[in-house]
Amino acid sequence: MKFAIFGDIHANLEALQTVLWDAQEQGCSNYVCLGDIVGYAANPVECLQAVQDLGCPVVRGNHDEGAASESSLEELNPLAQNALLWTREQLSEEQRLWLRELKLVRQVRDFTIVHATLDSPGNWGYVTNRFDAMASFSYQFTQVCFYGHTHVPRIFEKDDAVRAARGTDVLLQRGVKYFVNVGSVGQPRDGDWRAAYAIYDVQAQTISIRRLEYDIETAQGKIRAAGLPSLLADRLALGK
């Protein structure tokens, strides 16, 4: 059994379609979404529908929450605010309700999923180093937890200490916990513009991060055509 685990789509339909196609080619039979389906790019409705059509477990991200609420969005940067105000106008009330009702944390089979952190999932903190990871490990009751939010693929391990694993592929070891950032489908920020997602092979007990080229020019063109800030289109090619 293989799980395709993905998140931070951010309304980038071209990237999402590429990830879902690749997951099928890799033999994935199950899908899990770590949130932030919407925000930044120009296809929030289509991306939301694609995730809903999968019928898979989903957790709420901060951009999902922003799009579904009537809050001022003052905690977000101006680019994110601009995109979310536009996104609110695109989504139906039914779609916004669906986003509002998503849980912050879920257990799927033998692993946990969250968008940001386990210690305070609704405060949208970032796990970028082993000290951040320590706090989430304290609330992790499964061997593996998958998360997103930073848009940077990373694997943290915990046995008698917490450390960042080398690379983004791992063979699970007995007695070790793993806190795994699967990267971003639609807006990577690690200097690599390619879409990212993870495959968890239950039988082989492996987790691997895949990177995929997609039709970035079309995604950029849609952002500009929608009247969204051009910087949101430009940054896709920079991977930041």
Segments and roles (model prediction):
Residues Q52-L54, S138-Y139, L172-R174, Y200:
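Short, conserved loop/helix-junction motifs that constitute active-site signature segments
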Residues K158-K240:
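Acidic, His/Gly-rich catalytic cores of divalent-metal-dependent hydrolytic chemistry
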Residues V32, P57-V59, V114, F146, ...:
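Hydrophobic/aromatic beta-strand patches that form the interior of the parallel beta-sheet core
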Residues H10-A15, G39-A41, E65-A68, D119-P121, ...:
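Active-site environment of divalent metal-dependent phosphoester hydrolases
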Residues K2-H10, D110-T117, F179-G183:
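Active-site-proximal beta-strand elements of phosphoester/diester hydrolases
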Residues K2-R96:
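Core catalytic region of metal-dependent phosphoesterases/phosphodiesterases
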Residues G27, Q90-K158, K240:
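His/acidic metal-ligating clusters that form di-metal
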